[in-house]
Amino acid sequence: MAVQQNKPTRSKRGMRRSHDALTAVTSLSVDKTSGEKHLRHHITADGYYRGRKVIAK
């Protein structure tokens, strides 16, 4: 089993965790037909993708 030789400093711990923060979703697209907002490269809630119906409900 691996055991650390020395305790990592607060600085090293902070540098390791510097990329762990969550970021807000900033790029929402608007559907051409319904005007609904959705994530890029995802279908809308009513089944449209790039202006076409891809899932029939």
Curated annotation (Swiss-Prot):
<dbReference type="GO" id="GO:0000302">
    <property type="term" value="P:response to reactive oxygen species"/>
</dbReference>
<dbReference type="Pfam" id="PF01783">
    <property type="entry name" value="Ribosomal_L32p"/>
</dbReference>
<dbReference type="GO" id="GO:0009314">
    <property type="term" value="P:response to radiation"/>
</dbReference>
<keyword id="KW-0687">Ribonucleoprotein</keyword>
<dbReference type="GO" id="GO:0005829">
    <property type="term" value="C:cytosol"/>
</dbReference>
<dbReference type="InterPro" id="IPR002677">
    <property type="entry name" value="Ribosomal_bL32"/>
</dbReference>
<dbReference type="GO" id="GO:0000027">
    <property type="term" value="P:ribosomal large subunit assembly"/>
</dbReference>
<feature type="region of interest" description="Disordered">
    <location>
        <begin position="1"/>
        <end position="38"/>
    </location>
</feature>
<dbReference type="InterPro" id="IPR044957">
    <property type="entry name" value="Ribosomal_bL32_bact"/>
</dbReference>
<dbReference type="GO" id="GO:0005737">
    <property type="term" value="C:cytoplasm"/>
</dbReference>
<keyword id="KW-0689">Ribosomal protein</keyword>
<comment type="similarity">
    <text>Belongs to the bacterial ribosomal protein bL32 family.</text>
</comment>
<dbReference type="GO" id="GO:0002181">
    <property type="term" value="P:cytoplasmic translation"/>
</dbReference>
<dbReference type="GO" id="GO:0003735">
    <property type="term" value="F:structural constituent of ribosome"/>
</dbReference>
<dbReference type="InterPro" id="IPR011332">
    <property type="entry name" value="Ribosomal_zn-bd"/>
</dbReference>
<comment type="subunit">
    <text>Part of the 50S ribosomal subunit. Contacts L17.</text>
</comment>
<dbReference type="GO" id="GO:0022625">
    <property type="term" value="C:cytosolic large ribosomal subunit"/>
</dbReference>
<protein>
    <recommendedName>
        <fullName>Large ribosomal subunit protein bL32</fullName>
    </recommendedName>
</protein>
